[in-house]
């Protein structure tokens, strides 16, 4: 495969006065033992926008995403250095309450992972764990979350039904509803439609576009068409580094870096 100069990069710098920043990383490195999976990534994520992370398998995009709310903490021999700045706080420090932080920076995984409970209990379980006991308030949160995830009309008459009986696409939207029930500011999604059929994928994409009015969304995807359709910004990862970061339309029509152009045009990956 063609070799690229990894120092040849183009990273858009957002103007925080005009483009409010929800989250940014500074010189972020992620190690698994002696293997450096992420090599000094600086990225800014604009509030209430969708940012897509793209790149070939093994480039580090999912590792980077998981580092943003410290999901890598539970992996043996993993180590993260650098800053993950959220509301002027570096969440990559021992002083941060990780459990509370993950309420603000939620995560939806590649494969739907509903609890083996009812649809209603999937939404309310974490809320109850945090002390919410008011039945009326819980009912309101369930309805609001399911409506935002475009699932309410399909399940409103069967909230006591097992979540495992839902279709794959419905399960993934339930997982999105479960995440937003905690009222996060940021929603991280790791290839949320990769296991779904085209119709379900389209529904999830439409849901995410509608959600950005209330949430900042960062999504890993292997689907170039998906990134082009729904994201405002795109970051191209390659060999643990961000090679190019820009408005999505520029990444897909006028990339500045040869490696980016070769990847989005299908020459490798």
Swiss-Prot record:
Q: Which UniProt keywords apply?
A: ATP-binding, Cell membrane, Membrane, Nucleotide-binding, Phosphate transport, Translocase, Transport
Task: Give yes or no: UniProt keyword Signal.
Answer: no
The enzyme's E.C. designation = 7.3.2.1
Q: Which SUPFAM superfamilies match?
A: P-loop containing nucleoside triphosphate hydrolases
The cross-references to Pfam families, in alphabetical order and at most eight, read:
ABC_tran
Where is it mainly found? membrane
Q: Which GO terms describe its molecular function?
A: ATP binding; ATP hydrolysis activity; ATPase-coupled phosphate ion transmembrane transporter activity
Q: Where in the cell is it found?
A: Cell membrane
Looking up PANTHER family in the UniProt record yields:
ABC TRANSPORTER I FAMILY MEMBER 17, PHOSPHATE IMPORT ATP-BINDING PROTEIN PSTB 2
Assembly and binders: The complex is composed of two ATP-binding proteins (PstB), two transmembrane proteins (PstC and PstA) and a solute-binding protein (PstS).
Describe the task this protein carries out. Answer: Part of the ABC transporter complex PstSACB involved in phosphate import. Responsible for energy coupling to the transport system.
**Can you say what this protein is called?**
Phosphate import ATP-binding protein PstB 2
Which taxonomic lineage is given here? Answer: Bacteria, Bacillati, Bacillota, Bacilli, Lactobacillales
């Amino acid at each position: 495969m063609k070799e690229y100069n990894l120092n040849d990069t183009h990273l858009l710098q957002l103007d925080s006065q005009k483009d409010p920043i929800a989250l940014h990383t500074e010189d972020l490195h992620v190690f698994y033992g002696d293997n450096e999976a992420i090599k000094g990534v600086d990225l800014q994520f604009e509030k209430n926008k969708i940012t897509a992370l793209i790149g070939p398998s093994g480039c580090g995009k999912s590792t980077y995403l998981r580092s943003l709310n410290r999901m890598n903490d539970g992996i043996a021999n993993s180590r993260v250095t650098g800053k993950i700045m959220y509301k002027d706080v570096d969440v990559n420090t021992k002083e941060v309450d990780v459990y509370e932080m993950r309420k603000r920076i939620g995560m939806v995984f590649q494969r739907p992972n509903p609890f083996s409970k009812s649809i209603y209990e999937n939404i309310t379980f974490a809320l109850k764990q945090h002390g919410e006991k008011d039945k009326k308030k819980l009912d309101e949160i369930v309805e609001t979350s399911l409506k935002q995830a475009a699932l309410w009309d399909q399940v409103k008459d069967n909230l006591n039904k097992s979540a495992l009986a839902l279709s794959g696409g419905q399960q993934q939207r339930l997982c999105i509803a479960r995440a937003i029930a905690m009222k996060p500011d940021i929603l991280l999604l790791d290839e949320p439609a990769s296991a779904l059929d085209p119709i379900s994928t389209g529904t999830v994409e439409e849901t995410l576009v509608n959600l950005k009015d209330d949430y900042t969304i960062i999504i890993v995807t292997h689907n170039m068409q998906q990134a082009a359709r729904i994201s405002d910004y795109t970051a191209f990862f390659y060999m643990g580094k961000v090679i190019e970061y820009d408005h999505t339309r520029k990444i897909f029509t006028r990339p500045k870096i040869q490696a980016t152009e070769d990847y989005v045009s299908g020459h490798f990956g």
